[in-house]
Amino acid sequence: MTQITERELKKKYLDLLSQHFDTPEKLATEIINLESILELPKGTEHFVSDLHGEYEAFQHVLRNGSGNVRAKINDIFKDKLSTKELNDLTALVYYPEDKLQLIKCDFQNYGQLNVWYITTIEHLIQLIKYCSSKYTRSKLRRALPEQYVFIVEELLYKNNEFKNKKSYYETLVNQVIELKQADDLIIGLAYSVQRLVVDHLHVVGDIYDRGPQPDKIMDTLINYHSLDIQWGNHDVLWVGAYAGSKVCLANLLRICARYDNLDIVEDAYGINLRPLLTLAEKYYDADNPAFKPKKRPDKHERLTQREESQITKIHQAIAMIQFKLEIPVIKRRPNFEMDERLVLEKVNYDTNEITVYGKTYPLKDTCFQTVNRDNPAKLLPEEEEVMNKLLLSFQQSEKLRRHMSFLMRKGSLYLPCNGNLLIHGCIPVDENGEMESFEIDGQTYSGQELLDVFEYHVRKSFDEKENTDDLSTDLVWYLWTGKYSSLFGKRAMTTFERYFIADKASHKEEKNPYYHLREDVNMVRKMLSDFGLNPDEGRIINGHTPVKEINGEDPIKADGKMLVIDGGFSKAYQSTTGIAGYTLLYNSFGMQLVAHQQFNAKEKILSEGIDELSIKRIVDKELQRKKIRNTNKGKELQAQIDILKMLMHDRYLD
């Protein structure tokens, strides 16, 4: 094969580029456009984390832009509208379809309604004009309702200086109303406002877990205009299950059974659980208290006795399968250092005791009827058949394929973005703050390099779904539960102990030292440097651990260098945190941390217009307003400009 020199490659590239920019005027126009964009203020970044399947609460935070929508409305209208009018306009932007129906019921005749239409369209146009003031016209156009772009642009850029077009603008709006298009236009404008107040969304992990509707969250994210995802431990568990890890699949199903969320698997993703139920009905009892499903906070009606009985049996069946499946993985991967988790081999089945970490405990609520004492890892033929069927169903689910592919496409283990490091869990360190090493395939890795290797194997496992026992697939499970995992962040997962040992001391899961060292500003600066970021300007933005504000914990740590934004969307954690978690806004003026109150119901917002927000705390204020030039996007644009200028000099100026 002929070797192409760098010079020849550059010439071929410029030749291709010149086909698109075939005149100096076209090329100059593009350079001028890109250079000008660099001088615009950076767009607003919105950081959310730990959604845990709580679709309703997440939807609300997305619709209100963590309070950004109301702030913009107040900026323009606070001295012009009454409190009720402000509240109504806010609710209309958040939930346009629902609020429109309520408002229309208040009017007695079409004349009153038409006046309201004219006023509301004018208010929304003003709001869009304000929210889009730092965008180019082409970017704004992409955010407008597609079918009404012409009308909206005419109203946005109206200039009646010489009084020649007054009748024209009035006719535009009147015809919209007369032709019954006002509702759709208002709905479209409301969604344009939502889109304009947030330029880019960062989801810092855990879309999945115990909440009831992660699939709806995924559908919402797929349709969102601009985002990235940093995988959480629960996200990787789902990826692992889809990629062929039966032990990940068993874990996932056990969690769904424990939190009465099997309908995610059955109804949302169309997975048939009947074979698992048949197995469970054959071997397990319905009255094991350790395996009764937890009450779901979002479910008002109680489970029937039959439903509870079936879930309790399924819960036991899949837990036993999980503990069996863990054994061969641990044994074939001695570098995982997980021998203490060979729990079924450590049980004394005669005395009903277990010895773990050098201590012997009596066992309660046991369900070992399918365990072979001489070979605890051995699955019954029925268990093996059930897991094969379930794995095939998972991999054949079109909806799950779409969601997992999107997670892989938009996701990563960590992301350096605009000078900050976004990471869900932790950077594994020892007590001295040194990066912990982990051996993979005969080579030792730590820090950023370790995370890069983990991510490589997640992607490899996903691409080779037919391989279920290879190193890559086992490493996806290790990310869920291993002591050097950046996602788990603890020394061991004590699932077995929580089910079967009464002594709660055995349930304790020791956290990686990262979680107390992240309070230290020098430690955080060192981590930022290790990831190639400027420690003077950068921050680590972290999810995964609920901030217990109720106990005085502060989400702003290490002199503002570490921000913990576990969204607290999971209702199960809200009693221990005291709030419904944090989100973060980062615009050209600086960063604001937003503390959310518990989201009760959108009905309250629709009727009263009072938002469940949210206390904003300024993390910092930029001394100089940040421009697109100072962002990752700015670097990309600058690289494009450099190439275009090279073409200009090569073809037209020299």
UniProtKB/Swiss-Prot annotation:
Its EC number is 3.1.3.11. Residues 298-307 have a biased composition (Basic and acidic residues). It catalyses: beta-D-fructose 1,6-bisphosphate + H2O = beta-D-fructose 6-phosphate + phosphate. Keywords: Carbohydrate metabolism, Hydrolase, Manganese. Residues 288-307 are annotated as: Disordered. It is an enzyme of class 3 (hydrolase). GO terms for biological process: gluconeogenesis. The keyword Manganese applies. It comes from the Bacteria. GO terms for molecular function: fructose 1,6-bisphosphate 1-phosphatase activity. Pathway: Carbohydrate biosynthesis; gluconeogenesis. Disulfide bonds: none annotated. The keyword Cell inner membrane does not apply. Its cofactor is Mn(2+). Belongs to the FBPase class 3 family. This is Fructose-1,6-bisphosphatase class 3. It comes from Staphylococcus aureus (strain MRSA252). The lineage of its organism: Bacteria, Bacillati, Bacillota, Bacilli, Bacillales.
